[in-house]
């Protein structure tokens, strides 16, 4: 690997962005690929295939070429608002899927290291919490508290910052009331419809782990709808 490419890789890792390393195995030439950015002209004719590998998080040699694609994809960021019982099962599923998890809950007796070991916990109100962290387009919000004082500011932030997945726990009636509050706060019907409520796919389950499974299944489905 040439020094110029190695330096570029180091810089991209410092920037904390998703990218791919493209290498011509025949001559050793290479470049960095980033989604929606111009590709080195030497690899232009492979751009469609490179995009496909990147979207599928796939490493390997493009068929019938000497072009090797190695992807470095940042994990999906999952912000769980409300350290309730369901959240413990959600965290377990999300960790298995290598998601980057943050629990947000101002109630320290719920959001504790004892209940959520080895998980990033922010014991602040959502508005304050999101000032500390850096969500991006690969961020998901799961609101679980049933408390408008906690859930609503988080939902508003997620809508305004284009989270790819936004879900909120509660009955149909609870969600109707939630939508009415958001509309009163100035959000459009189109924006409000971004929220999955009631959250989760219809598995028919009633227990905390079953509800958590329905939520994480819906989230994974939305991950791949982005592709």
Regions found by a protein language model. Give the residues of each.
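ADP-ribose/adenylate-binding Rossmann-like module
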Residues: 140, 145, 156-181
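A short acidic, amphipathic alpha-helical/loop segment
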Residues: 93, 153-157
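Conserved beta-strand segments of alpha/beta enzyme cores
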Residues: 100, 120, 191-194
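Adenosine-phosphate binding glycine-rich loop
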Residues: 169-227
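Segments forming oxygen-rich coordination pockets for charged ligands
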Residues: 1-117, 174, 180-183, 218-227
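Conserved SAM-binding strand-loop segment of SAM-dependent methyltransferases
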Residues: 119-125
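Beta-loop-alpha module in the N-terminal Rossmann-like domain of NAD(P)-dependent dehydrogenases
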Residues: 148-152
């Amino acid at each position: 690997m040439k020094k110029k490419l190695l330096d570029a890789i180091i810089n991209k890792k410092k920037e904390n962005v998703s990218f791919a390393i493209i290498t011509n195995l025949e001559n050793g030439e290479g470049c960095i690929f980033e989604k929606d950015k111009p590709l080195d002209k030497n690899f232009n004719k492979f751009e469609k295939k490179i995009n496909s590998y990147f979207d599928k998080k796939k490493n390997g040699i493009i068929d019938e070429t000497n072009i090797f694609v190695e992807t470095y994809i940042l994990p999906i960021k999952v912000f769980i608002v409300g350290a309730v019982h369901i959240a413990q099962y959600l965290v377990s599923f999300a960790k298995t899927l290598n998601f980057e998890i943050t629990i947000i809950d101002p109630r320290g007796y719920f959001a504790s290291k004892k209940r959520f070991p080895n998980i990033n916990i922010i014991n602040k109100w959502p508005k304050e919490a999101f000032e500390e962290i850096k969500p991006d387009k690969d961020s998901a919000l799961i609101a679980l508290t049933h408390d408008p004082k906690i859930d609503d500011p988080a939902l508003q932030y997620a809508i305004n910052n284009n989270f790819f997945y936004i879900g909120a726990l509660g009955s149909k009636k609870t969600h109707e009331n939630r939508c009415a509050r958001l509309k009163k706060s100035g959000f459009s019907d189109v924006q409000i419809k971004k929220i999955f409520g009631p959250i989760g796919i219809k598995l028919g389950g009633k227990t905390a782990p079953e509800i958590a499974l329905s939520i994480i299944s819906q989230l994974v489905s939305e991950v791949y709808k982005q592709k």
